[in-house]
A protein has these predicted regions:
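Extended, compositionally biased flexible segments
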Residues: 2-103
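Catalytic-pocket segment enriched in acidic/His residues
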Residues: 5, 10, 40-50, 54, ...
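Residue-level recognition of short, solvent-exposed, well-ordered loop/turn junctions
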Residues: 94, 109-111, 219, 236-237
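Glycine-rich, charged/polar anion/phosphate-binding loops
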Residues: 98-104, 121-126, 151-155, 169-174
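Short Gly/Pro-enriched turn/cap motifs at secondary-structure boundaries
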Residues: 104-108, 160-163
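Residues embedded in well-ordered beta-strands
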Residues: 113-117, 139, 185
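N-terminal accessory regions of nucleic-acid-interacting proteins
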Residues: 123-138
Length: 260
């Protein structure tokens, strides 16, 4: 099932999403993101809805340098183990929301990524076991980064954690198949900047989940950002940045400078 989360006068709601004529449509209401059946409703294109982040995580676990070409473009060594960091839930941004370039940073970069939502409490998993019961679904994310602060600080909490620095959405696909790898692209103002495949992960999803859950418990709803391919670059006020993976729609956000 594919679903979205959107704002209504009565509060946030979940809705079933279907593809029609190349566009995503809301076709039913869901009582929760784990529901298996939807109450039919008159179809509405998602472009007419006020979309929200479909994930409400207790934590956002991210993987750095998980594509060989990205590690090389930044002049970094290829990690021998997954390189983990966090983004705070307060950094979440809805599809269509505005990424704010903080005054504290002179360079803010985009990083398009595949994101995985955890579906079942996970602790000390094995990469050899069937991990599908622990996966709720997949969505898109943009790991926005204050690149100058990342280099200056040495650790990444501030550079990755500003408000609006984690756009997520627009939909979740609970049956998304990662077996053969999927193509991820990022465009800025319509110009292709990133093109990669999850088949090129240095650490595949089973290895990531085993490594992460050896250290911490993942709760239902937690978000895992799996890394970004080569091509990252700066954003300036007025830009529009779009992350796409076939089947997951388009995650588009605009950019503005902090004004207060």
């Amino acid at each position: 099932m594919k679903y979205c989360r959107f704002a209504t006068p009565e509060g946030p709601k979940y809705g079933e999403v279907t593809h029609r004529a190349g566009e995503l449509w809301l076709t039913g209401f869901l009582p929760s993101p784990t529901s298996n059946s939807a109450e039919p409703c008159p179809p509405h294109p998602l472009s007419e809805l006020s979309l929200l982040s479909p994930a409400i995580p207790s934590k956002i676990v991210c993987v750095g340098r998980n594509y060989l070409d990205h590690a090389k473009e930044l002049g970094n060594e290829v990690p021998s183990e997954p390189l983990l960091f966090f983004k705070p839930p307060s950094s979440l941004l809805a599809p269509g929301g505005v990424i704010v370039r903080p005054k504290a940073s002179a360079r803010v970069d985009f990083e398009g990524e595949l994101a995985v939502i955890i579906g079942k409490r996970a602790r000390k998993l094995s990469a050899a076991e069937d991990l599908r019961p622990y996966l709720h679904g997949c969505t898109l994310a943009n790991d926005v980064t204050a690149r100058d602060l990342q280099k200056k600080d040495g650790q990444w909490t501030r550079a990755k954690g500003f408000d609006t620095f984690c756009p997520v959405g627009p939909i979740v696909d609970t049956a998304f198949d990662l077996t053969d790898g999927v193509t991820l692209e990022t465009r800025v103002n319509g110009e292709l900047r990133q093109h990669g495949s999850t088949a090129d992960f240095i650490f595949a999803l089973p290895a990531l989940l085993a490594y992460i859950t050896a250290a911490m418990t993942l709760e239902p709803g937690d978000l895992l950002l799996t890394g970004t391919p080569a091509g990252v670059g700066p954003l300036v006020a007025g830009d529009s940045v779009t992350v796409t993976i076939p089947g997951l729609g388009e995650l588009t956000n605009t950019v503005a400078d902090e004004n207060s």
